[in-house]
């Protein structure tokens, strides 16, 4: 199958490309820059130049493939306008999905467990409503297209980690270094799910190959961690001696986007993906990666 992957040189996108090609699929990778295009060409990946700010460029990529896996996310600076960011994302998704109507082609959207809001202490399954305005419009658009001849699928990742990278984990490290200790919000009792990079790449491929239209899948490894415990492990890995720092809930803006991620509980069930797709996440745990793996100091 020929798959158009947006964000093909990003953290998750690059792992998906590697998994797809390893399984015999052909990838058309979207590149925003000459640098990204060169990275794809070095790996033998066909390049399609495009970007979120130019929806028509993404439509052209979608038309050239049998399936689309959308992982691209806008680049964010310190003065980012989130309303404009959201508009750009929803416009690009809508354009691609509309171009696929009546084709029975596959469109896989990267959403996120953050769409559930605060899950509390119980792991939620995919029947839980998506309420966050950052996630709901795109999910509604993509899922609604199932009735119009699009094989729509949604993946809802939690915190992705591995290989000493990850936007979320590295932001957590950077904030902790700035604050002089592993950062958590409030009492640090918010709960979180997470998933190793190779495992989420495998999930995307299995969804591409096996899923029925109109299905969503949570992406995690089944473990549940307190954010304070993770913050302490990050402190050790960052050479901060295990010291931790609490940011009060009413000052969560000091933590930037990472504060919104770790300030409330986001725990999910993965039984559906395991049952329907025969998916079995098997990578090292986040705590192992922090203590002795790719993030260890």
Q: Model regions: which residues?
A:
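Mid/C-terminal beta-alpha module of Rossmann-like enzyme folds, strongest
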Residues: 2, 203-258
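N-terminal Rossmann NAD(P)H-binding glycine-rich loop of SDR-like oxidoreductase domains
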Residues: 3-23
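Conserved Rossmann-fold NAD(P)-dependent oxidoreductase catalytic core, especially the SDR/UDP-sugar
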Residues: 28, 88-133
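NAD(P)H-binding glycine-rich loop region in Rossmannoid oxidoreductase-like domains
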Residues: 29-94, 98
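Conserved beta-loop-beta element that borders a ligand/cofactor-binding pocket
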Residues: 140-163
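Alpha-helical substrate-binding/gating segment
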Residues: 173-182, 190-224
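Conserved C-terminal active-site "lid" loop/helix of NAD(P)H-dependent oxidoreductases
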Residues: 252-280
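Amphipathic terminal alpha-helices
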Residues: 284-297
